[in-house]
Amino acid sequence: MFRKSLASLVPILLFVSLTNAQQRAEVSLQLGEQFFAAMLDSIYQNFNPPAFRLTGESGCGILKIIRESGGARTAAQFRDGQIRVPLAFSGNYAPPFVGCIEFSGWADSVLDLEFDQSSQKLIGRSRVIGVHLDGTGGMGSTAIAKLLQSSIDKRLNPIEIFPLDKLSFGVPIPSTGTLRMRAVGIRHEVSGGVLNLRVTYEFTKG
């Protein structure tokens, strides 16, 4: 009974303590590599691999981001203050005078996060910094890297991570009203092998 009363009392005290001045607080969310590994496993078990067109409109010129290739797995890694994203892939393209050829390998990429003030969204931009092709000794990797980055820029960047309105919510106050918790800002930090997201909330009477 005491716990139930205390649980009801806390939101009431928060609601009553609000004045005309807006009050703010910060909430921290910590995401580790294991979280993204489980999420990627679920994606590849339940959906088709993400696919991008590299060139033209014919059947040749498709790249798929797959779970694993050549011992490398698509993943999110938090290293040295960066979000490193190895991308395993397979696909095909048609170099001049050669015809359609198949390829596979993995790309080393970095995901840069930023808060877009105008759209009120946390967004990411993927940068390909290297491509490793299976069984070619590096031949053709530069061309594939350019095609991959161009396709990502056209069809993926910027990547919407968190729109702030999806992080906002209301807390019902019994017999009184609603405490609105509106997300007004978000910042991030990569350290200790985890991604830390800090969301700033503004508290108002609803």
Can you annotate each of these PLM segments?
Residues 1-7:
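Bacterial N-terminal signal peptides that target proteins for export
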Residues 5, 17-19, 122:
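N-terminal cationic amphipathic segment used for targeting or macromolecule association
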Residues 8-16:
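Bacterial N-terminal signal peptides
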Residues 21-206:
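Extracellular/lumenal and peripheral-membrane lipid-interaction modules
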